[in-house]
Amino acid sequence: MSDDKKAQYAFVHAAVWADDIKDPAHGYTKDDDTPTGQNIGYADKNMHRYWHFKDVRFSTDGTQFVDADPINAVSQIKLFVAALPTSSGASDDLRSYDMVWLLHLIGDIHQPLHATERMSAINPDGDRGGNEVNVMPATGETIDLHGYWDRMFGGYVSVPGAIFDANDKGGISKLQVDSVKAKILDPDVWTHESFVLGKKFAYEEPVLSENTVAVLTRTYETDARN
């Protein structure tokens, strides 16, 4: 493996660590009932599942709702970014921990269903970013809506596989970078963009009206991929 790919391996592997620790085998505590925005480094043994998203809520049937908890992906991105410069006085341990989380959360918040939650009579407490909504894509299996959109970004069983797809298949080289948007560093702006996309495309028909399993149309799946 070349030095460049070794460096990529480290970053790709680090970027999924925040999901890896959800596995009880890693010894981290599921703490969803006690949200906290603490930043103490690797001594923190909580999973912090609620750091992975910011639920911007909406309803299409008049269901009333309140804003979600203020501790979320955006609050943590801001906290971690502030600790990264050496001028922050934070320890190397803390800055390393924050970098690992940032690699993950910035990716999460660009997935529309990490920034969108529909409130409805069927799910008055919210659909948890599509986790409570079942859909059937053209492949024929039933999957939750959130998982369907997660797969839009690729799924790999190994870090080298992800790197191969990004490099050797021209994944990165084919990306067209919007130089104006690339200068937008405000996570609130990223989140709003994801919310707009989620509301428009993730919850379009047949998902919008179906209360059991939404059989996805070709139009829906084409819009999702694009």
Question: Locations of the language-model features?
Answer:
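N-terminal, motif-rich segments that launch catalysis or mediate targeting to/interaction with membranes
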Residues: M1-L105, P112, E117-N226
